[in-house]
Amino acid sequence: MVADHQLLNMIKKFIFTITFCLFTQVSFAASDDSGSDSSNPQKDAQNFVKRGKKLESKGKNEKALKLYNKAYEKLLEANKADSRNPDILNYLGFTLRKAGKYEQAEKYYLQGLEIKPDHNGINEYLGELYVKTQRMDLAKERLAVLKDCNCEEYKELAEVINNN
């Protein structure tokens, strides 16, 4: 009788545990797929950009653009809180450039360079924008800024310039 009672309690605990696990899994599955689980819009945006770059490298440009647009929305939020952050301005420029909004992108890049003229990412991406908009002289100026950095940004911009 005592053994039956213990067995019954063990079965109840087992069922409770299984039920709890199932409900937990369902609630995670039902959460939105925004890719955002933090209250840090800059980090969220960086994650969207990273995922977008992976998709773009696989030729999935439309899906990548959707992620870049999500990143842009998060970056606007981050920029309201910290409008003098050159990294945020760089990512704003990047997402707009990827969307083909070159004038807007250039404005953000230039704002970032006012704050940090030697920002490697901004100099590279602004150079790429200049190549895309047929302003090779300005692209080469950005490359000259990166010349002594011994960084990937220099190599990547040099490659873009040489291929055009």
Regions found by a protein language model. Give the residues of each.
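Terminal, low-structured helical/coil segments at or just beyond the last alpha-helical repeat
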Residues: 32-43, 54, 138-164
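Structural marker of alpha-solenoid helical repeat scaffolds
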Residues: 81, 115, 146-149
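Residue-level recognition of tetratricopeptide repeat
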Residues: 85, 119, 151-154
